[in-house]
């Protein structure tokens, strides 16, 4: 093992990276509330793991979606647990995100020179809410269907572009298979990818600028 480690160390300088990560200065005013962002990240990782597991059984069609969720909950080993953890961590992620935003705002963490960190955080907050909206519809039960119908119908009040925007969101004039396909694609591919990119940017900026000082 020593030779293998030395081979990688010679090329990647792993020890220098580890020293940089473990020796970062932590201000004395930091308390447990500064962990809310990290908890949000942890919830996101749980979401990715449990969501990936559920894709093996979920079928994104209007005729099979609900039945596939029922099958996952009743017939798949620990399927009920996987879906329950996914739902619980989703709620926890939203709660931790909201608390994190309040903590950053109340402690002035959005001020110069951390404006871009704040902007990426706001984008991540929007993405988090979007996860909830798109994921809520995937079981395609009565609650999910009508939630999608209401949410996608909101932009119709916008002058000129309202109706085309609604049709873009739904994939057609009415809510149906195209809508479910769009929401499934957003929930399982587009939103996770965007979230991962903005989280990386967010943490790199925090790493570069450090934790903001006390008010």
UniProtKB/Swiss-Prot annotation:
Subcellular location: Plastid, Chloroplast thylakoid membrane
Superkingdom of this protein's organism: Eukaryota
Residues annotated to bind heme c: 35
Sites where the protein binds heme b 2: 86, 187
Assembly, per entry: The 4 large subunits of the cytochrome b6-f complex are cytochrome b6, subunit IV (17 kDa polypeptide, PetD), cytochrome f and the Rieske protein, while the 4 small subunits are PetG, PetL, PetM and PetN. The complex functions as a dimer.
Function field: Component of the cytochrome b6-f complex, which mediates electron transfer between photosystem II (PSII) and photosystem I (PSI), cyclic electron flow around PSI, and state transitions.
Name of the protein this chain belongs to: Cytochrome b6
Phylogenetic lineage: Eukaryota, Viridiplantae, Streptophyta, Klebsormidiophyceae, Klebsormidiales
